[in-house]
Each structure stands twice: as C-alpha cells, then as structure tokens.
C-alpha cells in the first residue's frame, strides 16, 4: 500500500492526495448515524462502507477516487478528467475475453446474465454528477432498509441496473475494466524479458 501511495503522489498530476481513516473522513463528510452503527456492529463491512464513502466524496467534491491498492505506473489520462464521470467497464468488443475469463471467471464474464460490469476502485467524477448522485442515493436507501448485502458486488450490480434501465444516455465512455488489471494478471509470473517487450 505504501508503494501505491507513492505512485499516486508521483502520477496524480496537480491533485492533492488525501488519505482517509476513521477520523479524517469526518472532516469531509457527515455520514448518517445508521450507516456508522451498521459499520460498528459489523452488519456492514469496510468494503461496502467504502462504496458509500467513495460516492459521497465524489458527489460532494468531485475528483478521483482510488482504492489504496491502486498502483499507478504513469500519469492519469487527461481525458478521464474531462468527462462528467468515468469508471472502467466491461467492454463487449474486447478481443481476448477468453483469457480474462480463464484468469478469473467469477469477476470477468461477458455473459448477459452477469451484472458485474464495472470497476469501482478508480472513479473520476465532477461534483454533483447525476449518475454518481443516483448511485449514492440507491446505496443509502438500500442500507437504510437492510443489514446485509445479497451480493458482494452490490455497487457494480446497482450501476449496471441504473445504466441499462434508466441512464443509458448518461453512460460514460466504455474503456475495458481489464486494462487496470493487466499488471496484476502477470504479477506472480516468472520474469520474462520477451514478454516485457
């Protein structure tokens, strides 16, 4: 995680990198008490709490959310900053789908039945973006009425349903969610200079 932080500071352009913890997040957001109670009572895990946190921060301030485990190897593309919002999504036109399905068939699927079609660890957004605001509202309503999730990927599923059924015209440009996983896919492979080229 320390290496990831350094990469964000190096390649984050002029953005201020803010590292959040349980105390510092209170400086930026007023999280509803029912959410904090569910988190403290372990009815909500930190992964699902971070879904609320990322959307609330983007809704209120705009900017870029990156999970602490994101390793940047180059500067963030300016085109992502120019869009109203951007996140990596499943690309129907990807040529090497089979390779990705073989790598992780639970996450990477191009089946029409699959509702997990976006990556939430990197999200760009302008303040008060319609899609981000609606996703946040959906999550808040869900957690107000539930104590557990039916699927770990609830944010991704809600995004898919929102875009497919209501906000198709607001969908950001589709750039494959395999792209941010390229390095991780070969992380534990034996070093090969040919493969590097």
Please tell me what each predicted stretch does.
Residues 1-50, 68-197:
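Glycosyltransferase-associated regions of secretory-pathway enzymes
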Residues 61, 66-67:
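Active-site acidic Asp-centered loop
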């Amino acid at each position: 995680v320390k290496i990831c932080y350094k990469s964000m500071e190096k390649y984050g352009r002029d953005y201020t990198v803010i590292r959040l913890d349980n105390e510092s997040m209170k400086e930026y957001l007023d999280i509803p008490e029912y959410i904090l109670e569910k988190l403290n009572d372990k009815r909500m895990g930190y992964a699902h709490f971070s879904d609320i946190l990322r959307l609330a921060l983007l809704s209120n301030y705009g900017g870029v959310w990156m999970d602490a485990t994101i390793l940047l190897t180059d500067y963030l593309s300016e085109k992502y900053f120019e869009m109203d919002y951007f996140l990596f999504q499943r690309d129907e036109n990807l040529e090497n789908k089979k390779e990705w399905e073989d790598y992780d068939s639970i996450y990477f699927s191009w089946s029409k039945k699959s509702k997990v079609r976006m990556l939430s660890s990197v999200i760009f957004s302008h303040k008060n973006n319609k899609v981000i605001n609606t996703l946040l509202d959906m999550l808040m309503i869900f957690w107000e009425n539930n104590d557990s999730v039916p699927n770990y990927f609830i944010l991704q599923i809600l995004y898919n349903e929102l875009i497919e059924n209501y906000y198709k015209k607001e969908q950001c440009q589709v750039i494959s969610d395999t792209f941010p996983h390229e390095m991780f896919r070969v992380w534990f492979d034996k070093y090969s200079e040919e493969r590097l080229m």
